[in-house]
Amino acid sequence: MPKVKGITVGEELAMLKEKLSGAGVDSAAVNAEQILGKAANLDRSEIFLNMEMELAANEARKAEKLLKRRLKGEPLQYIMGTTEFFGLPYHVDESVLIPRPETECLVEWSLELLTKNDSPKILDIGTGSGAIAVALAAHKPEAEFIAFDKSLKALKLAAENSRMNDVREQIQFVVGDLFKEDFIFSVGKNFDMIVCNPPYIAEGEMADLQTEIKDYEPRDALTDGADGLVFFRRLIEVVPKLTKPGGWCLVETAAERGSEALAIMRKVLPGAELRCDLAGRPRMVGGQFKR
């Protein structure tokens, strides 16, 4: 009996694109390439150089399983297990928020302010995947970091990301709760900079989010369960105790509440300002602490 011909790389790629596009998935071609690449252990160039190559049966089955996950709404980054932020690779899973391009603007602002400080002491509150701390450490090799989060699972992933990017020795990972009395004792004082990407989505806005966000990313990293400003109110309580005179505090916020976040932060950082992301939306608030 003649052997039944299997599906080729090119045929599988076309099928994946068609199903993803038909389901309304954005960037269907990119999604298809990454899913096929993971299933067949091929990078993008290898896919296009081997379009006539026959896929092994187990590779085709794996591609189908990955496709089903994506069609249900699971973020591509979780399916792949990796993403990129500020030009660096990161492992991600459902224990951490997927790093966003707009947060790179917060990193750029931080580096801009630290130009004349080669060895700053920096606190990253709610580090998650470690995206901000790792990116800053990669550009400030003499800096010292405390990366703080209430999730031990997230901190383990962040530590893995710091090792992958060769900055593990610069970062101390601390588990705890920003809202507990022992928070300051657990992280220390005299920081040159505090950076934070807090949960800033209001509880009432959660239902309007995309499925791949609200059903897959950690809820505690998205919303404070209230008006999206709870963390800002807590930050102004601790910033004066944590920051040395002349130190900075930079926080990401929702564009819809930028002015409200600014008003809160100005209670302890009178010169605080709003910065916009690349789309021109007011997404960051920051200022210098002066006793």
Model feature map: region roles:
Residues L36-E112:
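Conserved AdoMet
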Residues V167, E217, T243-P245:
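Helix-to-beta-strand junctions that scaffold the AdoMet/dcAdoMet cofactor pocket
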Residues I35, G73, T103, I132, ...:
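Residue-level signal for inorganic ion chemistry
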